[in-house]
Amino acid sequence: MRYLYRNLSLVFVVFLWSCTSGDDIVDYSNLGPDETESGSTPGFNEDRNVYFGDLHVHTKHSFDAYIFGTTATPDDAYKYAKGGTIQHPLGFDMQLREPLDFYAVTDHGFLMGNVEWWADPNNTTPGTEPFTNLNIPENRTVESIPRRGALFATQVRSLVADFNFMGMVKYLWTGDQARVISIYDVDKHRSAWRDIIRSAQDHNDPGNFTTFVAYEYTSSTTRSGENVTTLNPFGTGPYEGGNLHRNVVFKGDRVTVEPFSRLKSLNPEDLWTWMDDLRDRGVDTLAIPHNSNGSNGQMFELENWAGYPIGKEYAEFRMRNEPLVEMTQVKGTSDTHPLLSPNDEWADFEIMDTRVGGTGWSRPDGSYVRQAYLDGISLQEEQRGNPYKFGLVGASDTHTGAISDDESDFHSKIGILDGTPQGRGSVPLPDEQVQLIMDNDDLPGARLIGLKKFGDTYYSNPGFRQWSASGLAVVWAEENTRDSIFNAFRRKETYATSGSKIKLRFFAGENLSDTSLSDEGLIKQAYSKGVPMGGDLVGGDESPEFLVWAVSDTRGAPLQRVQIIKGFAENAIGEPVGRPNEQVYDVACSDGLEVDPETHRCADNGAKVNL
């Protein structure tokens, strides 16, 4: 009887341990630097400094990054951001032209840390055999792409759909759907998350380099456009449809035991509810949607997840949790599209017109930030609130730990898959690679590469042929610390670049023209008389004045022009609510040129691209 009692006690203790809530909060301040008093760093500037960084970086803990050869750790990623050299999965060195000011590793919450475990030769879990020794040195070659493509396209999905009886018991006991999956190891998941947290704490250096604990919430909709609210262990739908991905950034040292992932819910509104609950418990976070361009029109809809028209409550709910949006990255620009901005001659800049993770066309309507701005204005006109009053950031979405934001040193983002010019379709394929693609054409995942023939020459024809070097998040903050930079995110004093370190200030207010541009106190007066980018200017009787200050990247090309794009609602005769509209204005020209008062455009200065 004593033996039976002891074993029952052991089972009970194990169940209690396994049921530790992933939403419990842990304080990791003991792992980071000593707390820094606000305003105490040497670079503190009450008029604010400009800081450049990236809030979208993947390492080996992301399932897709590991599948395509990445073994870089979070420590490697932060080393790279601070100017160090790390290796690409194909073996060449990667190093930035100059260090960044802040960085966040944002590995997928979905299956975080599990694929590396599947590849461990000591792992005997049934179903994981195809992953064994995936990233040992002799396997990290371009010849391994067909195998990796098949693992990505089908094997992960089939393993995620697999479940067993004990998994169902754990799910019913904990409410965590991840426990249903037979090959999902919660300990490996939590261990990887702790490694991400530990690394961010180790590399955070107030006044010099800022890190944030963060991860990616990888939600999506089905290809048909219908919403899927939960993972169905009895048979999932298409692996990827309309992209609804977000990066979730924690402000400080207090972090949850687990990230909230798609295995808990695909509904972004459930993520926001989770974030609201954390905020009530003293933990501030924000979510940053990305790649709306690949959302098939579903990132900026006028309905909520359940299909009801959105109103003020939804607008406040979303803005409280998503004050920023990622407007540009390697997978294209989400600013606007030629079909949405036909009068903007640069609306086709770095467009990716397919959905994320697939080759299907992504519907522009509802997929681009500028249209979301206009829809937000219309909703506000209808007294329904504005859920799309975003600040802007850029990012890389690198899956190698290393941002690739310079075309002269572009190594794309998915490791072995797109790490060579041949793989990206930039130069012809050698005969042996052509034969490799042909021989594996029937494998799942073959669509990731494909072939295209010009004359007698073959090129790869991948879905990522439209990708390009990008991008950076830029903030104006008093000092290079978590509190100061996160507060800048909150007030949306941010902007995006496609990779260059352009310095930009923008203010709106009244009587700004009374201040001389050469006045040493220009910025201080601009803050006192107006509001900076991201702020709300309360309407007055007079038209607002704008102050724009821009400086080119010292390592890049000169600036050709400065534009302001006006979004507004215009009432037609008999219409109670205005229709959204936009107008592009050039406001400053290079080379001493003047803006044409009729076209609102700068004259062509004859600048050419040196190819």
Cite the ranges covered by each PLM segment:
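Low-complexity, serine/threonine/proline-enriched polar segments
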Residues: 130-174, 586-611
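Bacterial N-terminal signal peptides that target proteins for export
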Residues: 1-9
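Long, charge-dense tracts
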Residues: 249-250
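Conserved, charged catalytic cores of large soluble enzymes
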Residues: 254, 264-269
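C-terminal functional module detector
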Residues: 20-74, 78-81, 85-134, 182-185, ...
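C-terminal motif of bacterial Sec signal peptides marking the signal peptidase cleavage site
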Residues: 16-18
